[in-house]
């Protein structure tokens, strides 16, 4: 008798993806973040759905509706803070996942990697639009500043910005469309994530050594299901510690002031997970140049396979590249810190140096280190 798990048209797909999937025997905890991202996405969709039941996307009532959710809706406060802090956990997992891919050379799976970059952009767009919805001061001014960047595009810029706004400023039309997009995008992300997995399962997973995984495979269940459950428990623990003890730790106090177009906050800054890109944007005195640098800071990931000069896939046995990788991590943390600081001395010059270092490391220094390591192998 055939097993239903293996014969049923729908169960067969799930079985081949999560149960009988051959997985490398030596993948470390850095390979847990894929499943954690899936959990984050499901959590965000569920909490977001319940928030949408009580939220009103209208400039006059949006701020009040969020206050109403926190005060009057049963467990509304926990749903709201799980959603807000869930976004932070999502980005922590995302950056860890991308960093793992860079360190272990996973970008050589071209289709998987490129879908991943598209996913990153989609999640960033979703998070940005979600931040606008509570209609606090930072929501309004963040939306104004970031959408205004598109006006730097020659010839069509101004028309494009007004088209996105649905008027001559960020107003009711903007809020309504941002809510619509914020609702639909996570489902598009879920579909893209399935394509991401589809392409990954065509090749199988990479492993820390960077050599072929085919020599030693084990079934995904029970080995990696139990490992993923442990990861999930730690993720939920971290999220709930944040939500229940310091729910506003990562937020901006300005967002507890209702949006006021006549009063500009002294320091306009996005959520912490965009600060590194914001620092790169601000470090260039030219508007168009800043916008290009901002986009390229993420789009540069597409070039990773082209910039791979090493004869080895992973950085596991490449000390020079490892050193540069961790300098890049430190550099990104520096940019994150600078993005949250006011535009004044010495932060301006630190931001400019960190921005130059960021592009220099990825485009020049890391490929050069790879080539030096290749020559060392000849001995």
Swiss-Prot record:
Major site of localization recorded for this protein: mitochondrion
GO biological process: mitochondrial electron transport, ubiquinol to cytochrome c
Binding note for cofactor: Binds 2 heme b groups non-covalently.
Amino-acid positions noted as binding heme b b566 in the UniProt annotation, renumbered to this chain: 97, 196
Subcellular location(s) of the protein: Mitochondrion inner membrane
Cell division among keywords: no
Metal-binding among keywords: yes
Keywords: Electron transport, Heme, Iron, Membrane, Metal-binding, Mitochondrion, Mitochondrion inner membrane, Respiratory chain, Transmembrane, Transmembrane helix, Transport, Ubiquinone
Cofactor dependency: heme b
A GO CC term attached to the entry: respiratory chain complex III
Family: Belongs to the cytochrome b family.
Remaining remarks: Heme 1 (or BL or b562) is low-potential and absorbs at about 562 nm, and heme 2 (or BH or b566) is high-potential and absorbs at about 566 nm.
Reported function: Component of the ubiquinol-cytochrome c reductase complex (complex III or cytochrome b-c1 complex) that is part of the mitochondrial respiratory chain. The b-c1 complex mediates electron transfer from ubiquinol to cytochrome c. Contributes to the generation of a proton gradient across the mitochondrial membrane that is then used for ATP synthesis.
Annotated protein name in UniProt: Cytochrome b
Organism field: Bubalus quarlesi (Mountain anoa)
Gene name in the database record: MT-CYB
């Amino acid at each position: 008798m055939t097993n239903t798990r293996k014969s049923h048209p729908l169960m067969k797909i799930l079985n081949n993806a999560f149960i009988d999937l051959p997985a490398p025997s030596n993948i470390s905890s850095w390979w847990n973040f894929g499943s954690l991202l899936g959990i984050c996405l499901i959590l965000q969709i569920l909490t977001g759905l319940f928030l949408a039941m009580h939220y009103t996307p209208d400039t006059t009532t949006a701020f009040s509706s969020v206050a109403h959710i926190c005060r009057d809706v049963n467990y509304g406060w926990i749903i709201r803070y799980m959603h807000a802090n869930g976004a932070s956990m999502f980005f922590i997992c995302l950056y860890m996942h991308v960093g793992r891919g860079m360190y272990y050379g996973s970008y050589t799976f071209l289709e998987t990697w490129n879908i991943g970059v598209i996913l990153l952009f989609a999640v960033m767009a979703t998070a940005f639009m979600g931040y606008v919805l509570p209609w606090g001061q930072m929501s309004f001014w963040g939306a104004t500043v970031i959408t205004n960047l598109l006006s730097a595009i020659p010839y069509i810029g101004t028309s494009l910005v007004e088209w996105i706004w649905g008027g001559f400023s960020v107003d009711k039309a903007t809020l309504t469309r941002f809510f619509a997009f914020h609702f639909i995008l996570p489902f598009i992300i879920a579909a893209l994530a399935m394509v991401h997995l589809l392409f990954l399962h065509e090749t199988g997973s990479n492993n820390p050594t960077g050599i072929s995984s085919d020599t030693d495979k084990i079934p995904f269940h029970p080995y990696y299901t139990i490992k993923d459950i442990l990861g999930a428990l730690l993720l939920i623990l971290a999220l709930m510690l944040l939500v229940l003890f310091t729910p506003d730790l990562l937020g901006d106090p300005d967002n507890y002031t209702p949006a006021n177009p006549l009063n500009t906050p002294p320091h306009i800054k996005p959520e912490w997970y965009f600060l590194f890109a914001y620092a790169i944007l601000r470090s260039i005195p030219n508007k168009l140049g800043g916008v290009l640098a901002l986009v390229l800071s993420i789009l540069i990931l597409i070039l990773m396979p082209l910039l791979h000069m090493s004869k080895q896939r992973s950085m596991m046995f490449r000390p020079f590249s490892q050193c540069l990788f961790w300098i890049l991590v430190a550099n990104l943390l520096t940019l994150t810190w600078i993005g949250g600081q006011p535009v004044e001395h010495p932060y301006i010059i630190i931001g400019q140096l960190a921005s130059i270092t960021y592009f220099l490391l990825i485009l020049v220094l890391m490929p050069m280190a790879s080539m030096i390591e290749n020559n060392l192998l000849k001995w």
